[in-house]
Every structure is written in structure tokens, then in C-alpha cells.
Amino acid sequence: MSFFNRHILLKVLSLNAIAVFVQFILGLISVNIVSVYLGPSGMAFMGNLRNFTSIFKSISIVGLKEGFIKLFIENKETEQRKKIFSSFLSFFGMITIVCSVISISFASKWSQLIFQSNQYSHFLILFGLLLPFFTFQSFLAALLNAQQFFKKLIALQLVSSIVIFAFTTFFTIRNQLEGAILILVISDVLLLVCTLYFLRKNEAFHYFNTLKNIDFTYLKSIQKFLL
């Protein structure tokens, strides 16, 4: 490894260490705030909600990062990359829409299951409506990863962690359980805003060429990464 590459690697590792440390500290503070303002029952409800949203998010992008990044790196031509991007985005977009419909259609039942009450069903409807933002943000993050913009990725993680922590703290103190639920539900929108800011001067937007670039060859290859 050359001196230049070694220097870059050390910088990336240092930034990553700082980001992990900051996220760890923010996590500890966040847990303490939630425990004080929500109590044991509120923390249990938030844990249930996190599990619920994690399941839907995992289904929405299952195999995305592995498949997209692998194919993107293997294909150097811009036109091929546009086809890969459009094909993956359309496929996972359809999966996300199905997940969104399920979340919205059974919101009352989910609310009863998670919170032992259906009075929070509107938050689960909101989650379903905003789920596509999560999928889109995951695509942009995968695109940064595929382009090996590791420093930008680490900076994005750091900034988004601070932003979400600030909103979580404010709304949890101000509105207790409803505030904490709201931020958990809309956190992906905040993350998307941060991601778009980091990508504002990036060539990533060259890959947005609508549905005309969908290639069924890549759609078939996606199934290999779903297992």
C-alpha cells in the first residue's frame, strides 16, 4: 500500500472512530432522557415501535446494498449504471409501496399490538406514508458507498446522528411519548434531507433518468441478493 493510500485510510479510520464515539455518547444521553421522560412503559413502547419499523425497513431494502453496490462497482459505464440504478429503484420501490400499504391498512391493529391502544394508529399511517423516503435515502447512501465516498458517508452519519438526537431530545422533553414516537417515525425524512445536502454537488443525480432505463436483466439478477 502506497503512502498516499495509507494516509487516506488512516484519515477515514480516524473519522470513523470519532463518529462511532459521538454516536455512542449521544446514544447514552438519549437513553437517559427517554428513561426520565417516558418511564419504563414508554421505553417498552418505543422498543416495540423500533422493532416494528425495523422489520418493515428491512423488508423494503432486503438485498439492496449487497446487490446494488456489487453491480455498480462491476459496471463502469455511466449508461449501465443508470440502468442498474433505475432497475433497483423501481424494484425496491414496489416492495416499499406494498409495505407502506400494509402499514397504513392495518394501522389500528399495529397500534394495538405495539402500544396496547389504537390511539397511536395515526403515527403508523404516517410511518407508512414516509417509508419510501427511507428506501430512497438507502439508495443514496448505497450510491455513496459504491462510489467509495467513505469520508462523506462517515460525515453524513455523524451529522444525521446529531440532528436526530437534537430533535429527539426536544420533542421527547416537550411532548413525552408522542414526541418520541413522532421523531422515530419521521427520522428517515431528516436523514434524507442530510443526505441530499451532502450529495448536492455530487454526480449521483446523473443516475436519475426515470423509468426508461429499467433493464429486466438486472431485475432478474436482484433475486440472487434476496436470499
Which residue ranges define each predicted feature?
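Residue-level recognition of transmembrane alpha-helices
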Residues: 16, 20, 47-50, 92, ...
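Signature of the first transmembrane helix
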Residues: 8-66, 96-100, 104, 161-165, ...
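Hydrophobic alpha-helical transmembrane segments
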Residues: 121, 125, 154-203, 221
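Membrane-embedded alpha-helical segments of multi-pass transporters/permeases
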Residues: 28, 32, 59-62, 100-108, ...
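Membrane-interface helix-capping segments at transmembrane helix termini in multi-pass transporters
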Residues: 3, 40-46, 75-87, 97-127, ...
